[in-house]
Amino acid sequence: MLRVAVPNKGSLSETATSILKEAGYATRGDSKSLTIADEDNGVEFYFLRPKDIAIYIASGHLDIGITGRDLAADTREEVDELLALGFGASTFRYAAPKDENWTVEQLAGKRIATSYPNLVRKDLANRGLEAQVIRLDGAVEISIRLGVADVIADVVSTGRTLRQQGLKPFGDPLCVSEAVIVGRKGAEVTAEQSVLIKRIQGILHAHNYVMLDYNVARENLDKVAAITPGLSAPTVSPLANDSWVAVRAMVPKTQANSLMDELSALGAEAILATDIRIARI
């Protein structure tokens, strides 16, 4: 059976589990369950700490897994990123008290608190800087107030937690992260792995696209096709009135309203947008 690692808790867990369920896979009924065997699909899921998933994949004990790009990088394990999943977006930044003006160069010789010590050490080494990296397992933001650290390095999603603690980020992001599927470094993607990846891709396409249907005068077909090209080309079907055609195309969900406005301005009629439940592109 294909062995797949899934985050057991945290911000990645709920969305990852939801996508797998939409993709037709069995999900655990008890949040404390560590494994579940989906016999119908030939997959066994292991629910693990997100920080540990890349370790299990790199060692070959599991085949593929869902984790954060930043979490995988911090393990220093060699894994291949097979698919970016588009959720769990964040950046990894240095941060300091908002009334202090820090630059990255000033980190030399300072104390940096973080839950991602390897990412920080790698960044410092790349910059030719030496600093004391203090590993904490959580609540990193409070370490400056308690005198444990001079600055912190932490995951930033909305920045609200930093602001609540009177901190602000500085310097470029050390890592731009999102949820990803990872596999063992250099390993060929198997047929079983490909099926799971394509199923998940189909769900992501369904989340991100809508199907746009409309009727338009044949003389305007080239114009409307230019703004709704679909993924390959729009589907064009004849109507009872030979001077008109029906057009169908997938469009990004975020652009649907503006595209409908443009189509209407070009004389299109009966413009409908419908959700896509599952797709194979």
UniProtKB/Swiss-Prot annotation:
- Matching SUPFAM superfamilies: GlnB-like, Periplasmic binding protein-like II
Which pathway does this polypeptide act in?
A: Amino-acid biosynthesis; L-histidine biosynthesis; L-histidine from 5-phospho-alpha-D-ribose 1-diphosphate: step 1/9
Q: Which reaction does it catalyse?
A: 1-(5-phospho-beta-D-ribosyl)-ATP + diphosphate = 5-phospho-alpha-D-ribose 1-diphosphate + ATP
This protein's record includes keyword ATP-binding: yes
The protein's GO terms of the molecular function aspect are: ATP binding; ATP phosphoribosyltransferase activity; magnesium ion binding
> Which domain of life does the protein's organism represent?
Bacteria
What is the native source organism of this protein? Corynebacterium jeikeium (strain K411)
Enzyme superclass (EC)? transferase
Pfam (any one)? HisG
Entry's Gene Ontology cellular component terms: cytoplasm
- From the Swiss-Prot or TrEMBL record, state where the protein is found: Cytoplasm
A GO BP annotation: L-histidine biosynthetic process
Keywords for this entry? Amino-acid biosynthesis, ATP-binding, Cytoplasm, Glycosyltransferase, Histidine biosynthesis, Magnesium, Metal-binding, Nucleotide-binding, Transferase
This chain's protein is named ATP phosphoribosyltransferase
